[in-house]
Amino acid sequence: MEVNILAFIATVLFILVPTAFLLIIYVKTVSQND
């Protein structure tokens, strides 16, 4: 079973980018509430 490296990277980025974006918003919100 071949592993398509580009497809793997694209999938990882597709998951990590929105996750990082939500984490940044969460941290900013928590910091403002302090």
UniProtKB/Swiss-Prot annotation:
Q: Per the UniProt entry, what are the Gene Ontology biological process annotations, in alphabetical order?
A: photosynthesis, light reaction
Gene Ontology cellular component annotations, sorted alphabetically:
chloroplast thylakoid membrane; photosystem II
What's the chief localization of this chain? plastid
Record carries keyword Membrane: yes
Q: How does it sit in the membrane?
A: Single-pass membrane protein
* InterPro entries membership: PSII_PsbM, PSII_PsbM_sf
Lineage, top-rank taxon, reads Eukaryota
> Where is the protein found, in the record's own terms?
Plastid, Chloroplast thylakoid membrane
The membrane spanning regions, by residue number, are 5-25
Protein purpose: One of the components of the core complex of photosystem II (PSII). PSII is a light-driven water:plastoquinone oxidoreductase that uses light energy to abstract electrons from H(2)O, generating O(2) and a proton gradient subsequently used for ATP formation. It consists of a core antenna complex that captures photons, and an electron transfer chain that converts photonic excitation into a charge separation. This subunit is found at the monomer-monomer interface.
Q: Which family does it belong to?
A: Belongs to the PsbM family.
Subunit description: PSII is composed of 1 copy each of membrane proteins PsbA, PsbB, PsbC, PsbD, PsbE, PsbF, PsbH, PsbI, PsbJ, PsbK, PsbL, PsbM, PsbT, PsbX, PsbY, PsbZ, Psb30/Ycf12, at least 3 peripheral proteins of the oxygen-evolving complex and a large number of cofactors. It forms dimeric complexes.
Q: What is this protein called?
A: Photosystem II reaction center protein M
Q: Which organism is it from?
A: Piper cenocladum
Organism placement in taxonomy: Eukaryota, Viridiplantae, Streptophyta, Embryophyta, Tracheophyta
